[in-house]
Each structure stands twice: as structure tokens, then as C-alpha cells.
Regions:
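Extreme N-terminal leader/targeting segments of oxidoreductases
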Residues: 2-31, 49
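Mobile amphipathic helical/loop "lid" adjacent to a hydrophobic cofactor/ligand pocket
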Residues: 9, 21, 96, 101-197, ...
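N-terminal Rossmann-like FAD-binding beta1-loop-alpha1 element of flavoenzymes
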Residues: 30-56
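Conserved flavin/dinucleotide-binding core of flavoenzymes
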Residues: 42, 50, 124, 258, ...
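Glycine-rich FAD pyrophosphate-binding loop
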Residues: 48-71
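Conserved FAD-binding subdomain of flavin-dependent enzymes
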Residues: 66, 74-105
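Active-site/ligand-binding neighborhood in enzyme catalytic cores
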Residues: 151-248, 255-258, 277-279, 287
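Mid-domain catalytic core of redox enzymes
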Residues: 247-358
Length: 458
């Protein structure tokens, strides 16, 4: 039998029994979706609902990608993802479609923050009085740079795209105390002040009318009732796509008439179109032919810098709920919130700006880090998922390096021949979250459906 590249037209159309490619062509899919995170699952649903034959390939043994609802301390917790909001049109549509609600945020009045070498305590009102002018200064030009967030090309953003988060922080000329207060609040969003671009934070604020308060509420306040997996499973159960778990992909080759996807086991899968819905930091592990455009390849090679961690802690005793902040690089644990009562004990959720600074499985190390905020805390147990060391994530949510928001991501959203890209990491409006993943999956699926219809008509 001849190889695909030399398979003759006659052979293809007469389906010779001894030709492996002809045998595969009988089972050609309309679309192969690679990655069953939120973007891949919703795209597979929409494509199959449009009448296309779809296969959904996932390297893990579960769907959901970087959203992951699991068990800890005898209850359900979110290891990745969690929050949604009624102002997020794409995710709200899905929640309404499947009759899934939101849980109210935990009420917390006590705030603890480490600044200028000291621990400070106050109420939410007192902390807001302190932080509001700092955040206003930090985000003040968000709408100036992104007046129409759905179209970032309307003005030249090259100046702001060159700047890092540290450039913005330095430009504010804050006192040590003020700088630490602002650094601490933003630490949940920061891995490296030097590697992350300021443009994405300003863009996020601009999508919420330049109102940083609205942005923070939407980003991390209202958990999905039943967990993110309830939503992901509801979407998948509404799909007729063929799902294959534990199926990593190594190669995606666009040969013009069809795309050949090679799995780690060596299986060849053929499709008219391929939709790559993988995390940005994983795409470099897949050989894509032909090569993508240079700005896209540069972003793939550079990866995004977010090597953060989310940690769940079981602590002895019930104590007054609090939220705590410490600046990046000044404590291994940077944000803490008392999330639940658990019998006679308490469960805390913690966010770590740099996962390499602490072993999240080391109870003593975690207790020592938490003693910055509560000196008498006794940690009983800890649990987390290391997204940085997860080969199918290699990091948490996306935050672009300087230049990538406007100079690379838009190119990645365009078709690459018969290969398309989707995911929360490259979403047009809400990159970095579930809303962006769903947005990207829906929009890209619609583009593929249109392209297939045009090909059929033409």
C-alpha cells in the first residue's frame, strides 16, 4: 500500500482494500476536537448538534481540563475553576440551559494583610478605604487603551503592550506600605511581575466598564452550584461526539483534503477539520504541520508564565472567617480565605503565586506559611492538584507576556488551513477563565460549521 502523501486519486476513490489510507477514509470524521476542557466539550457539542461527525480526544482520564471538581476532607472542592457570574453571557447561557445555579459567596468581614514588614487587621470597609485609591490608580487608563474590548485593533496599543506589571507598579511611585498592600491584593493574579504584561489586566478591567470592583466580583465570588464538573458533564451529555479518554495526541498534519491526527499509541485518525483546544503551554508538545505563523509559534514556544497553585487546607477549630493577603515573593502563600466550616474545624482555600516556593503536600511547611496570618493556626491536612507539573496543563490560567495579547493571540484565533485553535487561553474577550473557554469553543465551532457548509456548497 502507498502512504497517504503518495496515495493516488484513483486509489482514494476506489477504496483499495490493501491501502491503509483508504481504510481510514471510510471512517473519516468531519471534525476532530483535541482536548476535552470547557472549550473542547462545548465545541464538540455544537458541532455534533449541527449534524457533523465529531471525535473528541482527551489525554486525561476525565473531561474538564483545568476545571476539576474533586474530593477533599470528605467534601467536594474545586481544584481548578469554580466561579461564574450572571454578567458572563456565554457561561450564563449554559447554566440557564442546564438549570444550574450559583452558590453565594462566603461572607467575610475580617481582612488581614502583610505590608511594610508588619501584619495589619481591619474590616472590609477599612480595607476598602485603603485599597480603592490604589486600584483606581493601577487601572485608571484601562478604557483608554481598550475602549472597545471586543475589537482591540481600534487603537494602537503597542506602547502599553511593551510594559510589564512591574513597570506599572513602579510608575505609581507608592510608599512601601502602599505598594505591599496593592501587591498583596493582586497576588492572586500574579506569578511574576516581570514576565506578565500589564495589557491583559487593563483589558480585563475594560471589559467590566473599567470598574475593577466589578472585575474582582465576577472573577472570584460566585461558585457554580454542584461544581464546575456538573456544568461540563451537562454539556458533554448533550453531545453526540465520540469521546476517547486517555488518548494523547502527538501529531496533527494538514494534507489539504483532510487532517491526519496521530495519537501517542500510533493510531491515525482522519478528519476534514481539526480543532485544537489544548492549553497554550501544552501545544508545543504536539507537532503541527504545516508550521503556524511566526507570532503564534513564538507565543507557543515562550508559553505563558502562570506557575501558580491552589491549595485546600483543613485547620483545627472554628475561627472567625477572614481573608488574608501577602505580597508576591514575601510569603509562599499569598491569599487565604476561610471557605467552610467542617464539623468542629475549618477549611481554607489558599492561592500561591509561585508553586515552586512551597511543597503543598508538606503540612509543616503550609502551617508555617499560614502562621504569617494566624500565628496559632494548626494545620491538620492539605490537598491540591499541581497544575504546573501536570503534563496536560503545565501551568494554570493564561496571562500573556508583553506583546502576546495583541500581536499573537489574534493570529491564533484565525484558521490555520484546516486546523483551528480554541480555548480560554486565546479567547477574544474573557481569556483566562471558563467564560473565555466557552466563548472560544462556541465561536470556533460556528466557524468550522460555516467552513464545512461552504465546502459542501462549493
Amino acid at each position: 500500500a502507498r502512504s497517504f502523501l503518495h496515495c493516488s486519486r484513483t486509489c482514494r476513490y476506489t477504496a483499495r482494500r490493501d491501502c491503509g489510507v483508504c481504510a481510514m477514509s471510510k471512517n473519516i470524521y468531519d471534525v476532530a476536537v483535541i482536548g476535552a476542557g470547557c472549550a473542547g466539550v462545548v465545541a464538540a457539542r455544537d458541532l455534533s448538534s449541527a449534524g457533523h461527525k465529531v471525535i473528541l480526544l482527551e489525554a486525561r482520564d476525565r473531561i474538564g481540563g483545568r476545571t476539576y471538581t474533586g474530593e477533599a476532607f470528605g467534601r467536594q472542592v474545586e481544584f481548578g475553576g469554580a466561579y461564574a457570574h450572571w454578567t458572563q453571557s456565554y457561561i450564563w447561557r449554559e447554566l440557564q440551559r442546564y438549570s444550574i445555579g450559583l452558590n453565594p459567596p462566603t461572607e467575610v468581614d475580617k481582612v488581614v494583610w502583610f505590608a511594610d514588614g508588619k501584619l495589619h487587621t481591619g474590616t472590609q470597609v477599612e480595607y476598602a478605604t485603603l485599597i480603592e485609591p490604589l486600584l483606581t490608580a493601577f487601572f485608571n487608563d484601562a478604557r483608554q487603551w481598550f475602549p472597545l474590548p471586543y475589537d482591540i485593533s481600534v487603537i494602537d496599543t503597542s506602547d502599553i503592550e511593551r510594559q510589564t506589571l512591574r513597570d506599572r507598579l513602579d510608575a505609581l511611585n507608592l510608599s512601601t506600605y502602599e505598594r505591599d498592600v496593592l501587591d498583596g491584593l493582586l497576588s492572586t493574579l500574579v506569578h511574576s511581575w516581570d514576565e506578565q504584561g500589564i495589557a491583559q489586566l487593563l483589558f480585563w478591567a475594560a471589559t467590566y466598564f473599567g470598574n475593577w470592583g466589578a472585575f474582582f466580583e465576577v472573577a472570584g465570588s460566585w461558585p457554580i452550584a454542584g461544581g464546575t464538573q456538573k456544568l461540563v458533564r451537562a454539556i458533554h451529555n448533550d453531545s453526540s461526539a465520540e469521546l476517547r479518554l486517555s488518548t494523547p495526541v502527538t501529531n496533527i498534519d494538514d494534507h489539504g483534503e483532510q487532517v491526519v491526527i496521530t495519537t501517542q499509541s500510533g493510531e491515525k485518525i482522519m478528519a476534514k477539520k481539526a480543532l485544537v483546544a489544548l492549553p497554550l503551554n501544552v501545544i508545543a508538545d504536539v507537532k503541527i504541520t504545516p508550521d503556524v505563523k511566526k507570532p503564534v509559534q513564538d507565543m507557543i514556544d515562550a508559553k505563558h508564565p502562570m506557575q501558580t497553585a491552589k491549595l485546600w487546607v483543613l485547620a483545627r477549630g472554628k475561627f472567625e472567617p477572614f481573608v488574608a493577603f501577602a505580597p508576591v515573593e514575601q510569603n509562599p502563600i499569598n491569599t487565604v480565605r476561610v471557605e467552610y466550616e467542617h464539623g468542629d474545624d475549618s477549611i481554607l482555600v489558599c492561592f500561591i503565586s509561585d508553586e515552586s516556593t512551597i511543597d503543598t503536600n508538606d503540612i509543616e511547611a503550609v502551617q508555617k506559611a499560614l502562621q504569617m496570618f494566624k500565628p496559632d493556626i494548626e494545620v491538620l491536612d492539605v490537598v491540591s492538584h499541581n497544575w504546573t507539573k501536570d503534563p496536560y496543563a503545565q501551568g494554570t490560567w493564561v496571562h500573556y507576556r508583553p506583546g502576546h495579547l495583541t500581536d499573537a493571540a489574534p493570529f491564533m484565533r484565525k484558521p490555520h488551513g484546516n486546523i483551528y485553535f480554541a480555548g480560554g487561553d486565546i479567547a477574544t474577550m474573557s481569556m483566562g477563565g471558563i467564560e473565555g473557554a466557552i466563548e472560544s469553543g462556541i465561536e470556533t465551532a460556528a466557524s468550522i460549521t460555516h467552513a464545512l457548509a461552504q465546502k459542501l456548497a462549493g
